[in-house]
Design a protein with these regions (language model features):
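Short, structured motif recognition centered on aromatic/hydrophobic residues
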Residues: 33-38, 48-50, 81-84
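Bacterial N-terminal signal peptides that target proteins for export
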Residues: 1-12, 18
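Short beta-strand-to-loop capping motifs
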Residues: 38-43, 85-89
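Extracytoplasmic/secreted proteins, especially bacterial periplasmic and envelope-associated proteins
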Residues: 48-55, 95
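An amphipathic, aromatic/His-enriched active-site/gating alpha helix that lines ligand/cofactor pockets
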Residues: 26-29, 57-70, 76, 86-132, ...
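Sec/Tat signal peptide C-region and signal peptidase I cleavage site
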Residues: 20-24
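Short structured motifs
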Residues: 34-36, 53, 67-69
Length: 142
């Protein structure tokens, strides 16, 4: 009889303990973020633009930031280059500015003026990805 009472007490304690535990659902990690940039070069400035972008890759590497992945236009729309790069933190931006200064390069608005010598226009679009269509549907709860 003592054994049954002990088992019943243990079962009751287990039920009470299990009912009081809050189970946290692991939320999915946030999706990766990126900036997609599309550049229209000034006619005759394609090589100069590529040199400027290569400088930015060296700055990023010196700051420990992943470089932009560049795609060159071959047929179709009017853009020349499309880049996909990481969304940086303020600390990464500061590290890149410091690296650029050490290399003797412009920072801040002056860096933007240097870029604009070689482009007719550009766009920057903040995105999430890369992800599959299935992953995007999961984010929608579908």
């Amino acid at each position: 009889m003592k054994q049954i009472i002990k088992l019943a007490a243990a079962a009751a304690f287990g039920a009470i303990a299990a009912g009081s535990i809050v189970y946290a659902q692991a939320s999915p990690p946030p999706p990766p973020r990126a900036i997609v940039s599309v550049y229209h070069a000034v006619p005759g400035h394609q090589e100069a633009l590529l040199n400027w972008l290569a400088q930015q890759d060296r700055v990023a590497a010196a700051a420990g930031v992943a470089p932009m992945q560049l795609y060159a236009h071959t047929d179709g729309d009017s853009w020349d280059y499309m880049g996909i790069g990481p969304v940086t933190t303020e600390a990464q931006d500061d590290a890149m500015d410091a690296a650029a200064r050490r290399m003797g390069l412009q920072t801040g608005p002056r860096a933007g003026l240097e870029l604009r010598k070689h482009i007719q226009s550009h766009t920057d679009t903040f995105t999430v990805g890369p992800m599959t269509a299935t992953q995007l549907l999961q984010r929608l709860g579908s």
